């Protein structure tokens, strides 16, 4: 689940597109597209992409909640390149030749935009590629957790992770998405004037950096980021010394007592999730806490009482025929109810908007009453200037599709070539619907399209091939649809910063190629160093089991559910739809108190501790806003990103130490007093 950053939620796209920063951007000299893609920029994007891939992988393999990191990526891109251009003048006497070279090529907002786009395309592969969900669901451990004897979970329906096939799979499906909607970029960005709120917010941030006032603000943000990065990294290093055994260290600190700790109610001192809580809205964090109380505080203790009646008493709790089955399928029910509701809602909004635009176009053939400010016209002119031929997009799409149709069935024998053909034929239609809906609502529905594809391909594949076919089909559709929407989102940022579509496409392609290599390598490092997918450990990777169970449901239907699980799951599905209806139809002053179903669902499998961490982040933001609202609005994203990056980057040396069999020297553990 990806949560929207509050600073993005507050952005008013209408005001942004006519602001003074935008006018200043339009007035300055815009470099040609080849000068916008620079070697120093690609090096910076590679470093940022690697750092954030490590962070994203940690988040995906622990809880699956991914906050929006685009704003902090833009900040890091600015920091890296501003430092690059100014370092020679500071380090060399008189500035040196390198300094004069830097002056010859100034750091522009266009270069900043391309670097941010490239870095985001790189690290997005960490969760968009399915390493915490559909791809991990293929491994043997998830196959065994789902129940070897479970109907539909056919024997041998697993594939262990490997660098070769994972890299090949990502290359086969990711680049096609870049060409999916390329011929429609003008229609979506200029003709329909879609806002793409997150893309607009990123453009505002980048435009703001490249003004005198914005540079002063950026200095404060950089200082806040570096301070919190250092604190977070040192704290993570300090914590490591106390984790020399099972259930040891500050990660298992029984903050509210041992009884609450057994039900996962404790603060685990994870600055990653404190930072994520600072970025996510208060509603997301409180929804997660509400879900934790409902599940671990009420539901699971009550269902545990039925052990021996509803489910066998002689099987481990991690079995799908035991308590874990109820946890898993009720979580799936909440997510599916939420996803289906929003899928129908966004599809309806998209259809209505397209119909209204069509009617307006017919009614105003001769005259157009819309007025454009000069800055808008200049943006449109720059956006259209560097033309990308449509034939190139069509030919590339056809060629890459043929490669995928040949390669994917070789990787997965259960996936027939015609499954891949169907996915690639549907991709442009689904991609346009998703890109248009994202532009209107800022909700990328690629995961929901992927889940629908999962059920269709799982049912189509039948009992023997259905699980693998469903999971792979889900990954194909999700990635095709997501990449095309992400590209339109980036084109919106480029449109507002006067960045060439060609340089944006090149940056996105380079970032995608980086991600296709970095993400599998990073995942395999984590996979070999830690116990990934253990439902009782830290690295729970809950979405892997959720996706596999959805594939089993697609194959077997409701016969796969434990006793009374169907009734309970149906109740949670209906509850999910109901609270979404309440959010849409209640007066605004009440709807902000209605929880979000998907945020509620994550603690069902993961536990309450991460929800408590995120609520601590919310509490910090709330208190800071009360004390100094202007300072908090400026520094919260930077401080939160520092916490996330410091704790997240420690995972890299930590995993290397684990692979080298270097164990922490101390185990700090808590037991009841005598």
Curated annotation (Swiss-Prot):
InterPro entries named in the record: OPT, YSL-like
GO cellular-component term (any): plasma membrane
GO MF annotation terms: iron-nicotianamine transmembrane transporter activity; oligopeptide transmembrane transporter activity
Annotated localization: Cell membrane
TM segment ranges: 41-61, 64-84, 118-138, 162-182, 224-244, 283-303, 329-349, 392-412, 420-440, 452-472, 506-526, 559-579, 604-624, 633-653
Renumbered residue ranges of the record's region Disordered: 1-29
Induction: In leaves by iron deficiency.
Signal peptide coordinates: none
UniProt entry keywords in alphabetical sequence: Cell membrane, Ion transport, Iron, Iron transport, Membrane, Transmembrane, Transmembrane helix, Transport
A Pfam family it matches: OPT
Distribution of this protein across tissues and organs: Expressed in phloem cells of vascular bundles in leaves and leaf sheaths. Expressed at low levels in phloem companion cells in the central cylinder of roots, but not in the epidermal or cortical cells.
Amino-acid biosynthesis is among the record's keywords: no
Biased composition range(s): Basic and acidic residues: 7-22
Family: Belongs to the YSL (TC 2.A.67.2) family.
UniProt protein name: Metal-nicotianamine transporter YSL2
Organism lineage: Eukaryota, Viridiplantae, Streptophyta, Embryophyta, Tracheophyta
């Amino acid at each position: 689940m990806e949560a929207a950053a509050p600073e993005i939620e507050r952005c008013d796209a209408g005001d942004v597109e006519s602001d003074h920063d935008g006018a200043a951007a339009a007035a300055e000299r815009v470099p040609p597209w080849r000068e916008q893609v620079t070697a120093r920029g690609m090096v910076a994007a590679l470093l940022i992409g690697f750092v954030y891939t490590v962070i994203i992988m940690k988040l995906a393999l622990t809880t699956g909640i991914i906050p929006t990191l685009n704003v902090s990526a833009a900040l890091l891109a600015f920091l890296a390149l501003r430092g690059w251009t100014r370092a020679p003048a500071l380090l060399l006497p008189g500035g040196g030749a390198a300094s004069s070279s830097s002056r010859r090529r100034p750091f522009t907002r266009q270069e900043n935009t391309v670097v941010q786009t490239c870095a985001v395309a790189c690290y997005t592969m960490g969760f968009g590629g399915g390493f915490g969900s559909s791809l991990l669901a293929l491994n043997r451990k998830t196959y065994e957790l789902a129940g070897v004897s479970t109907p539909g979970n056919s024997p041998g329906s697993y594939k262990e992770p490997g660098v070769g096939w994972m890299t090949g799979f990502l290359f086969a499906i990711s680049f096609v998405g870049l060409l999916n909607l390329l011929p429609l970029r003008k229609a979506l960005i200029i003709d329909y004037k879609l806002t793409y709120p997150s893309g607009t917010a990123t453009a505002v941030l980048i435009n703001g950096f490249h003004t005198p006032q914005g540079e002063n603000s950026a200095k404060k943000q950089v200082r806040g980021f570096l301070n919190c990065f250092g604190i977070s990294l040192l704290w993570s290093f300090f914590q490591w010394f106390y984790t020399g055994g099972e259930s040891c260290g500050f990660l298992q600190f029984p903050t509210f007592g041992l009884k609450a700790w057994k039900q996962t109610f404790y603060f685990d001192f994870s600055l990653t999730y404190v930072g994520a809580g600072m970025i996510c809205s208060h509603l997301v964090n409180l929804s997660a806490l509400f879900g934790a109380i409902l599940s671990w505080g009420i539901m699971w203790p009550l269902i545990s009482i039925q052990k021996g009646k509803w489910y066998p008493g002689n099987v481990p709790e991690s079995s799908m025929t035991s308590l874990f089955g109820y946890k898993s399928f009720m979580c799936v029910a909440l997510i599916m109810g939420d996803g289906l509701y929003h899928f129908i809602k966004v599809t309806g909004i998209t259809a209505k908007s397209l119909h209204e635009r069509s009617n307006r176009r017919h009614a105003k053939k001769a005259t157009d009453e819309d007025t454009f400010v000069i800055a808008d016209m200049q943006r449109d002119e720059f956006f259209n200037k560097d033309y990308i031929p449509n034939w190139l997009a069509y030919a590339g799409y056809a060629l890459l599709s043929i490669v995928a149709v040949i390669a994917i069935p070789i990787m997965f024998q259960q996936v027939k070539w015609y499954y891949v053909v169907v996915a690639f034929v549907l991709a442009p239609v689904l991609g346009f619907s998703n890109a248009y809906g994202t532009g209107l609502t800022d909700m990328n529905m690629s995961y929901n399209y992927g889940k629908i594809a999962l059920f269709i391909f799982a049912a189509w594949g039948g009992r023997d091939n259905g699980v693998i076919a469903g999971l792979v089909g889900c990954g194909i559709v999700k990635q095709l649809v997501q990449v095309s929407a992400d590209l339109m989102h980036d084109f919106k940022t480029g449109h507002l910063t006067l960045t060439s579509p060609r340089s944006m496409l090149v940056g996105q392609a380079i970032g995608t190629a980086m991600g296709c290599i970095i993400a599998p390598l990073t995942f395999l490092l984590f996979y070999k160093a830690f116990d990934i997918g253990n439902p009782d450990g830290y690295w729970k990777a809950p979405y892997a089991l959720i996706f596999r169970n959805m594939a089993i449901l697609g194959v077997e239907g409701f016969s796969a559910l434990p006793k009374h699980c169907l009734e309970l799951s149906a109740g949670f599905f209906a509850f999910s739809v109901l609270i979404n209806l309440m959010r849409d139809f209640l007066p605004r002053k009440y709807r902000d108190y209605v929880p979000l179903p998907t945020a509620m669902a994550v603690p069902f499998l993961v536990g309450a501790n991460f929800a408590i961490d995120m609520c601590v982040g919310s509490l910090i933001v709330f208190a800071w806003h009360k004390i100094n609202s202007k300072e908090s609005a400026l520094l919260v994203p930077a401080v939160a990103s520092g916490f996330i990056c410091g704790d997240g980057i420690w995972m890299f040396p930590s995993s290397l130490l684990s692979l080298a069999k270097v164990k922490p020297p101390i185990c700090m553990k808590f037991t009841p007093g005598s």
